[in-house]
Amino acid sequence: MELPTYAVSQSLLASRSVSSPRGDQPVRAATNGTQGQGQGQDGQNLTGKRKRTNPGYPSRESPKGSSSRCNGLTQYAVPASFQSPQIVQYSPPNQILRTPPSNDVDDQLSVNSRSEPVYPTLGVPGAVRQTQEQLQLHAARIPASHFLNNVPNFGYHSTDKDVAMKQNYFSDSTFFPSPAITDTWGELPAPDLSWETTTRPHSPGNRATPTVDKHVSVSAFEAALETGELASDRSIQNAYNAPSTTGDNHLETLVSIQDGLSQVLKAVEAAGFDSLDSAVIAYYQRSSKGNEWLRQEQRLNRMRRLPVLLKELHLAAQGWGQWERRNFQEQIIKSTEDILFAELQDHLATRRNSPHASPCSIEQRSQARQHMMEHDADPEAEFYDTSHGTEGIPADEMLHVNLLLY
């Protein structure tokens, strides 16, 4: 069996022992190149038997070069630099892998509280590792806004700008691009948000022009009211915008109001109404039909505001003249009498229908008549003598009527 031959350089033919792969016997390489060639020539006559090599002595038979066989395996002379390699991986110093701090302006955590970088480096030299630790310490001490501003590939660069806008109470137009928030009103007048409509009337430009119906007089009246109101508002608006420091402007304002009222009265007359009151009554009667909300509002007004109105009229009548006050009081008395008699009739009808009711005796009727005659000295008592419907009223109910009247 012919053995393979190998060509090995002279630098590798050093007298150095090579450990066996199995660790049983060291193998000594040949030191003479001619000897190796001779052995190679002698090795051509070898058979397939395995031969041993003594430790410390050169091998008698070896292939061409520095290769030898030990335990059936071919051994080679390897330099010392290749026998114990020290593999070190260096990371580029310009590309430092670190975890950026959180995006918090007030983040002042210590180095020990932060987590380690998620990108570890293998076999980093001491100088590079120290540089990384210094950079991490610097990144932990500075605010996150400065760190993010110095990172070129970070997608958000407006940290300092946002902080400045927060300090300026969001007055920067780039934060709120809407002109309705940042810009001023300009030449437009400020909106009227107060309840006082007499001092600052609303602009008539926002009102829609009403549609006039020729067949319905109320619709014509509504259109006339809108037209007159528009003219009046326009005159009031002009008077408000104009300087009112002189008396001439005040007179012009009064003339404008009178012109507006005259136009309203002409429109009321053209619509077929006798007066402005009748037009207003017709307007509210027509508007209240089918409007449940307005009907409920009218009920509440009768229950709450009508008594207040009557009380105000009664107090205001104290300052009127005698004849003016007398007519007003007579009308109130007549209305009160009608209300009382209506209530008494309902009461008597209820007593007649009751099974325990007793007819009114003659004595009770005479007592009631006598009680009425005692009040003849009163100048207003003649008003009660003219009514003969009280003869059939019992004495106790008649007393109730007199107490209510006086």
Curated annotation (Swiss-Prot):
It is found in: Nucleus. The keyword S-adenosyl-L-methionine does not apply. Its main location: nucleus. GO terms for cellular component: nucleus. GO terms for molecular function: DNA binding. The keyword DNA-binding applies. It comes from the Eukaryota. Belongs to the bZIP family. This is Probable transcription factor FPSE_09188. It comes from Fusarium pseudograminearum (strain CS3096) (Wheat and barley crown-rot fungus).
